[in-house]
């Protein structure tokens, strides 16, 4: 579960390395975000020459969480880190590559471009 002030690793080549959650989108008073949810975040660490800079306010979608997610078939999937992909307003990723596996729940939330760029979908 990702909440306000949570720090996440960025799993794409947009230039950001770490982001800090400002707000969880999707209703007033919503406190937590899981895999496939959109957040508003600020860039805390960035590489030189990247598309996004340190201090930029961006939207991102959660692709991996340590807390994991329950599936309908009874299985449960967890990851070793919390990670997100920076996206534009039309849900397309800013970067051109995705690093690491992503969860299958992104397909249900119509993030097909992220799923197609990912090296592995779990």
Curated annotation (Swiss-Prot):
Top-level lineage group: Bacteria
InterPro entries: Ribosomal_uL14, Ribosomal_uL14_bac-type, Ribosomal_uL14_CS, Ribosomal_uL14_sf
Gene Ontology biological process terms, A to Z: translation
Entry GO CC: cytosolic large ribosomal subunit
Keyword rRNA-binding: yes
Pfam family, one: Ribosomal_L14
Keywords assigned by UniProt, alphabetized: Ribonucleoprotein, Ribosomal protein, RNA-binding, rRNA-binding
Record's keyword annotation contains Ribosomal protein: yes
MF terms (GO), sorted A to Z: large ribosomal subunit rRNA binding; structural constituent of ribosome
PANTHER family listed in its UniProt record: 50S/60S RIBOSOMAL PROTEIN L14/L23, LARGE RIBOSOMAL SUBUNIT PROTEIN UL14M
Main function: Binds to 23S rRNA. Forms part of two intersubunit bridges in the 70S ribosome.
Subunit structure: Part of the 50S ribosomal subunit. Forms a cluster with proteins L3 and L19. In the 70S ribosome, L14 and L19 interact and together make contacts with the 16S rRNA in bridges B5 and B8.
Protein family membership: Belongs to the universal ribosomal protein uL14 family.
Name of the protein in its database record: Large ribosomal subunit protein uL14
Originating species: Oenococcus oeni (strain ATCC BAA-331 / PSU-1)
Source species taxonomy: Bacteria, Bacillati, Bacillota, Bacilli, Lactobacillales
């Amino acid at each position: 579960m990702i909440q306000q002030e949570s720090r996440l690793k960025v799993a794409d080549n947009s230039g950001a390395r770490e982001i800090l959650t400002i707000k969880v989108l999707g209703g007033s008073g919503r406190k937590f975000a899981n895999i496939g949810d959109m957040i508003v975040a600020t860039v805390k660490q960035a590489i030189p020459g990247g598309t996004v800079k340190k201090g930029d306010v961006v939207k991102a979608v959660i692709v991996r969480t340590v807390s994991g997610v329950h599936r309908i078939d009874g299985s449960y999937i967890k990851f070793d880190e919390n990670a997100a992909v920076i996206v534009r307003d039309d849900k397309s990723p800013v970067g051109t590559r995705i690093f690491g596996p992503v969860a299958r729940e992104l397909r249900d939330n119509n993030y097909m471009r992220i799923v197609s760029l990912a090296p592995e979908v779990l």
